[in-house]
């Protein structure tokens, strides 16, 4: 194990015993919602993984090391740290955060890197980043997509966030050779909504099939991971027809106010929260829990 990796006793034991493990990101804790709700949701997500027979390993940079698996005290400390004091880490700034001794929350890309270093093959998140609308002029494309082509981790998400350009995101993933596997349906889900209007490139209905695909990719010497897109539970979704005008309104307001670059996503998510009267956050929590359960089932299939 690299010396920069600090495994929790539970994570270390799970790796030694070849128990199923699921990596969890920390950006949702530090930048996703306020304290103490963020702590409660993090605990619920970990509990969902355990209910399906796997061990959760939340990942963050704390005290100059990559912590893989946070105990109750560390989780509380991270959740209660103001967001402005926490670096939001991707591939580009992971090493810098460690060098500076800062606290850092891992995005999808950084979590994949850290999970792979620790020997964890499955990771559950809410949604991945992707190609932003207007990327043909801004070139704003999330590092998550490139990471999926590099780090051999199976990522379970509810699709890319619906504020993004989903057709272009799918095209980039195809170009990068990333398998996009819809779980249990033919359409690509769109985060808050079960349907996006786009056909998924691949479909699988059994976690064992997804685990087998990961193993065969390794045997074939193929680099990168897999993206498993898991639709939000029907009772929690905000239907696509309802979300389209909400997203369009938030996007037009962002453009009118000249909001650009890294400020765009937080602005859009906050406006969507307001326009849906909080339903978008409720849906977000439901889909993360759903993804954690599926990831645990995939991890269990990989461990057999």
Curated annotation (Swiss-Prot):
Enzyme class at the top of the EC tree: lyase
InterPro entries assigned: Indigdn_synthA-like (IPR022830), PsuG (IPR007342)
UniProt KW Hydrolase keyword: yes
Gene Ontology BP annotations: nucleobase catabolic process
Pfam families the record matches: Indigoidine_A
Residues annotated for Mn(2+) binding in this entry: 140
Highest taxon of the lineage: Bacteria
GO MF, any single term: hydrolase activity, acting on glycosyl bonds
UniProt cofactor note: Binds 1 Mn(2+) ion per subunit.
Keywords: Glycosidase, Hydrolase, Lyase, Manganese, Metal-binding
EC number(s) recorded for this UniProt protein: 4.2.1.70
GO cellular component labels: cytoplasm
HAMAP family for this protein: PsiMP_glycosidase
Family from the record: Belongs to the pseudouridine-5'-phosphate glycosidase family.
Subunit record text: Homotrimer.
Name used for this protein in its record: Pseudouridine-5'-phosphate glycosidase
Organism: Paracoccus denitrificans (strain Pd 1222)
């Amino acid at each position: 194990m690299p010396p920069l990796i600090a495994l929790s006793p539970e994570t270390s034991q799970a790796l030694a015993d070849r128990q199923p493990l699921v990596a969890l990101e920390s950006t949702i804790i530090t930048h996703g919602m306020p304290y103490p709700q963020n702590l409660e949701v993090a605990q619920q997500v970990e509990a969902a993984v355990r209910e399906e027979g796997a061990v959760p390993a939340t990942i963050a940079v704390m005290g100059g090391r990559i912590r893989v698996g946070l105990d109750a005290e560390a989780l509380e400390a991270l959740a209660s740290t103001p967001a402005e004091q926490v670096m939001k880490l991707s591939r580009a700034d992971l090493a810098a955060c460690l060098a500076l001794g800062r606290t850092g929350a891992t995005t999808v890309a950084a979590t994949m890197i850290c999970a792979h270093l620790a020997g964890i093959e499955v990771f559950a998140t809410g949604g991945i980043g992707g190609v932003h609308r207007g990327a043909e002029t801004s070139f704003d494309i999330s590092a998550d997509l490139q990471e999926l082509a590099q780090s051999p981790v199976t990522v379970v998400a509810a699709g890319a966030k619906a504020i993004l350009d989903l057709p272009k995101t799918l095209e980039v993933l195809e170009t990068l050779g990333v398998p996009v596997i819809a779980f249990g349906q033919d359409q690509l889900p769109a985060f808050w909504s079960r349907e996006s209007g786009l056909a998924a490139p691949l479909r699988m209905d059994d976690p064992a099939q997804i685990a087998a695909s990961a193993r065969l990719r390794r045997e074939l010497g193929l680099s990168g991971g897999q993206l498993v897109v898991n639709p939000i539970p029907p009772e929690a979704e905000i239907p696509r027809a309802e979300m389209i005008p909400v997203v369009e309104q938030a996007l037009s307001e962002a453009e009118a106010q000249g909001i650009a670059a890294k400020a765009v996503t937080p602005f859009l998510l906050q406006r969507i929260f307001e326009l849906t009267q909080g339903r978008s956050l409720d849906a977000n929590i439901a889909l993360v829990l759903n993804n954690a359960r599926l990831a645990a089932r995939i991890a269990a299939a990989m461990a057999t």
